[in-house]
Amino acid sequence: MFRFILTTMLLAAILGCGGDNADKYTQEGFVYFQQQKYDEAIASYEKAIKAEPRAAAAYNMIGMAYRFKFNQQGAPEFRQKEMAAFQKAVEIDPKNWVAMINLATDHYADGEKGKAAALFKKALELNPNHPEKAEIEKMIAAGEPKP
């Protein structure tokens, strides 16, 4: 499942970035990401954003790199940067369901289940056949107010 998600994110990153340089840097960043060289990946994604400031997929991948750094080191600033990157990706491309799910997952993990539920719902509207739909629906239910 993890490979499917990463492959989906790479495809979204390549399609979501404009210009040859942005594509090149996004692909370079993904190679670093796969090698678990997260600082190098972030630097490459930042170059992609410099080449194409509306590269929502590059912001999403920066968020993923910070997520892995946070998971390894637990530094709160990595979580903040992770969430900010996902938020920026969603702001740039409100149909970017991948970034939306990533941001929702962070809110859910941080106990903000109401915020998470709203994002998860929107993501499922955009991608109703998501392979993890059943699990996402459980998280939506956990975040909705009880009657």
What are these regions (language model features)?
Residues 27, 61, 102, 135-139:
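Canonical tetratricopeptide repeat
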Residues 114-147:
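Terminal, low-structured helical/coil segments at or just beyond the last alpha-helical repeat
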Residues 21-23, 56-57, 97-98, 131:
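Helix-start (N-cap) detector for alpha-helical repeat units in TPR-like alpha-solenoids
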Residues 18-32:
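Bacterial Sec signal peptide processing site at the extreme N-terminus
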Residues 13-16:
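C-terminal motif of bacterial Sec signal peptides marking the signal peptidase cleavage site
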Residues 34-47, 71-88, 110-122:
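Structural signature of tandem alpha-helical TPR/SEL1-like repeats
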